[in-house]
Amino acid sequence: MASASSGPSSSVGFSSFDPAVPSCTLSSAASGIKRPMASEVLEARQDSYISLVPYASGMPIKKIGHRSVDSSGETTYKKTTSSALKGAIQLGITHTVGSLSTKPERDVLMQDFYVVESIFFPSEGSNLTPAHHYNDFRFKTYAPVAFRYFRELFGIRPDDYLYSLCSEPLIELCSSGASGSLFYVSSDDEFIIKTVQHKEAEFLQKLLPGYYMNLNQNPRTLLPKFYGLYCVQAGGKNIRIVVMNNLLPRSVKMHIKYDLKGSTYKRRASQKEREKPLPTFKDLDFLQDIPDGLFLDADMYNALCKTLQRDCLVLQSFKIMDYSLLMSIHNIDHAQREPLSSETQYSVDTRRPAPQKALYSTAMESIQGEARRGGTMETDDHMGGIPARNSKGERLLLYIGIIDILQSYRFVKKLEHSWKALVHDGDTVSVHRPGFYAERFQRFMCNTVFKKIPLKPSPSKKFRSGSSFSRRAGSSGNSCITYQPSVSGEHKAQVTTKAEVEPGVHLGRPDVLPQTPPLEEISEGSPIPDPSFSPLVGETLQMLTTSTTLEKLEVAESEFTH
């Protein structure tokens, strides 16, 4: 699952393309968060992968993995310029999607996951390919029929896919992962294209049958949505790319961003990361910034945790580990107070009909299959985000997704965990065996990061009209319901009424409805709640005799038979 990333943004996972945030200081201030001093920050391990070369015109001045940038700002990847790579990608996708549309639709077969189609693009053109001004290249498409099914499952039509990726130039993102990956975002902000290593592409191919089965069973998922896997062969090098959904829309200003694993070992953003326009903070930063966690409606919380549990089970079954939850936060209240200027306006493609956006997956759509609309979160437009609140009561929109899943727990990772565990507590290391990693990941997300707001009972009509409920509860001014966050993770609803000081009145829990025993279990003296009974105050139940119960049953039976 991927997201767009800004200028020099995160080197971990996928970041948000947010040109409106001018500096790290402003980003932190906007979210009301105090940052530690630079001397307290550990340098990220990936800094060791960056090599600086003495300045010379046309020579690379910075290189991370296969990605290098020269003094003129031109990016190359495996000795292929970024502009040539973007052109080759668009030419190849245009051809492969067009040729696939001429083939009749059918069910996906097992062999479809292993098909690789290849076509040569000479610069002078051929009877199948157009002429172009790039060097000759070959374009490979992996499992075209299977990926066509995936796109259809997510509601992406072939012409929409081509329009997004090939109608306008791709936008290169300046950030890269620790391995030096290249990132592109489509002009309409819908898709991310990322270069992947050979092992990652190979692992995705092996993952496809299980991925297909999982999507059939659970189309709503926070896992990355893979839309295509391709390879550009140019200059004797293979450049493999994957097309995914864009997690963070550029049209929404992100105030802060986190990459969370549930680990504490070296899980703090580096000083270099904090200097970026929109830094990607980590687990220790989150625990310091938001110790009380983020509050979601009960339905939303339950749906989110269930989705995380299901996704982690899938990842564990494939022995996948070291994945992260990328979470970007839009603070609605801060955004409403921020002055609008030309710098904060985002240029997104408006020529496309607005309803088209609904065809693509968002964080909200990934879990809303089980979450009911509405609740205590009052936002007119979620813009694809999950509504939440912080401990101050500020309204938030969360954009989340699981990223970095194309890694399996193999020998290298086992070795990495072994030597780390010799020096540090093994349970705090992020590289862990898949089963333990999944359990720790879920526990951290559902107990520390996300918290449940207790359900607020809807007042009955009698309560609104000031009838019997008001008389039982006393003065309406003496009754309120609040929730208070706690670092321990316990969040209880507090009901304050005059009944608290009146003996013999049991308040009960306002967020739980009393269970009425089945009729066949009712014996003499068993309490049966009256239809006008309100669970808020815990009014003493009326005691009905057996004769009254039988009388009601006879009336109900006569009404049913007639």
UniProtKB/Swiss-Prot annotation:
The keyword Ribosomal protein does not apply. It comes from Homo sapiens (Human). The gene is PIP5K1A. Residues 506-526 are annotated as: Disordered. Keywords: ATP-binding, Cell membrane, Cell projection, Cytoplasm, Isopeptide bond, Kinase, Lipid metabolism, Membrane, Nucleotide-binding, Nucleus, Phosphoprotein, Transferase, Ubl conjugation. There is a cross-link at K103 (Glycyl lysine isopeptide (Lys-Gly) (interchain with G-Cter in ubiquitin)). The keyword Lipid biosynthesis does not apply. Interacts with RAC1. Interacts with TUT1. Forms a complex with CDH1/E-cadherin, CTNNB1/beta-catenin and CTNND1 at the plasma membrane upon calcium stimulation. Found in a ternary complex with IRS1 and DGKZ in the absence of insulin stimulation. Interacts with DGKZ. Interacts with PIP4K2C; the interaction inhibits PIP5K1A kinase activity. Activated by diarachidonoyl phosphatidic acid (DAPA), when 1,2-dipalmitoyl-PI4P is used as a substrate. Catalyzes the phosphorylation of phosphatidylinositol 4-phosphate (PtdIns(4)P/PI4P) to form phosphatidylinositol 4,5-bisphosphate (PtdIns(4,5)P2/PIP2), a lipid second messenger that regulates several cellular processes such as signal transduction, vesicle trafficking, actin cytoskeleton dynamics, cell adhesion, and cell motility. PtdIns(4,5)P2 can directly act as a second messenger or can be utilized as a precursor to generate other second messengers: inositol 1,4,5-trisphosphate (IP3), diacylglycerol (DAG) or phosphatidylinositol-3,4,5-trisphosphate (PtdIns(3,4,5)P3/PIP3). It catalyses: a 1,2-diacyl-sn-glycero-3-phospho-(1D-myo-inositol 4-phosphate) + ATP = a 1,2-diacyl-sn-glycero-3-phospho-(1D-myo-inositol-4,5-bisphosphate) + ADP + H(+); 1-octadecanoyl-2-(5Z,8Z,11Z,14Z)-eicosatetraenoyl-sn-glycero-3-phospho-1D-myo-inositol 4-phosphate + ATP = 1-octadecanoyl-2-(5Z,8Z,11Z,14Z)-eicosatetraenoyl-sn-glycero-3-phospho-1D-myo-inositol 4,5-bisphosphate + ADP + H(+); 1,2-dihexadecanoyl-sn-glycero-3-phospho-(1D-myo-inositol-4-phosphate) + ATP = 1,2-dihexadecanoyl-sn-glycero-3-phospho-(1D-myo-inositol-4,5-bisphosphate) + ADP + H(+); 1-octadecanoyl-2-(9Z)-octadecenoyl-sn-glycero-3-phospho-1D-myo-inositol 4-phosphate + ATP = 1-octadecanoyl-2-(9Z)-octadecenoyl-sn-glycero-3-phospho-1D-myo-inositol 4,5-bisphosphate + ADP + H(+). Gene3D superfamilies: 2-Layer Sandwich, Phosphatidylinositol Phosphate Kinase II Beta. SUPFAM superfamilies: SAICAR synthase-like. Residues 81-449 form the PIPK domain. Highly expressed in heart, placenta, skeletal muscle, kidney and pancreas. Detected at lower levels in brain, lung and liver. Changing L223I: Decreased 1-phosphatidylinositol-4-phosphate 5-kinase activity with 1-octadecanoyl-2-(5Z,8Z,11Z,14Z)-eicosatetraenoyl-sn-glycero-3-phospho-1D-myo-inositol 4-phosphate (arachidonate-PtdIns4P) as substrate. It is found in: Cell membrane; Cytoplasm; Nucleus; Nucleus speckle. The modification Phosphoserine is found at S486. It is an enzyme of class 2 (transferase). This is Phosphatidylinositol 4-phosphate 5-kinase type-1 alpha.
